[in-house]
Amino acid sequence: VPTFLMIGILGRGDRRAAAWKITIYLGLGSIVLLAGLVWLANATGTYDMVKMVAAAGSIDPAAQKSIAALLIVGFGTLVSLFPFHSWAAPAYASAPAPVAMLHAGVLKKFGLYGLLRLAIPLVPEGLEFWLTPLLVLLLGNILWVGWVTISQKRLDLMLGNSSVMHMGYIFLAIAALI
């Protein structure tokens, strides 16, 4: 809601469309992420992170695959993982500079941090199962969005797409940990 208001009221250009787009994408991503977190808590029998890590080995491998998929899509939407990336560049281009900096510099990193702290230690078998499709999506971030970035004529859209492309490199480094 705050992002919607900051972009929708204080933004420039096609700010209303960008505000709606970011709200819908991040809202749907949050719902998917919430489903994964609730399933993870039910699989471990607790919402306490310390107990959850201790019980992570008892999660059924089939459940790990499903939970990992939900966490990848949920956190991937926040990080603007390809193909859930189309909200980022228009939002950054329409947002006031401080709002764009907040999203690109801080909020996207929450998605990566969530993967590092939750997905990797709690559902490692599920992440291993999804590693190849994840690498294909990461290549989409790096190659496709890189091509879109190079072809941009507007600097604000170029910077927005560049941020998305660089998240692919960071996500790729995290995938190397799996």
Predicted feature residues:
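Membrane-interface helix-loop-helix modules in multi-pass inner-membrane proteins
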Residues: 1-6, 75
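Small-residue-rich segments of transmembrane alpha-helices in multi-pass membrane proteins
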Residues: 2-4, 23-37, 97-98, 102-113, ...
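C-terminal ends of transmembrane helices
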Residues: 5-14, 79-93, 142-162
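Membrane-helix interfacial "entry" motifs
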Residues: 14-19, 93-97, 101, 124, ...
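Juxtamembrane/interfacial segments at transmembrane-helix boundaries in multi-pass membrane proteins
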Residues: 15, 21, 30-86, 90, ...
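Short beta-alpha junctions and helix-cap segments that line functional grooves
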Residues: 19-20, 146
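Short hydrophobic "helix-edge" motifs at membrane interfaces and signal-peptide entry regions
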Residues: 67-69, 98-99, 143-144, 156
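Transmembrane alpha-helical segments of multi-pass small-molecule transport proteins
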Residues: 69, 133-149
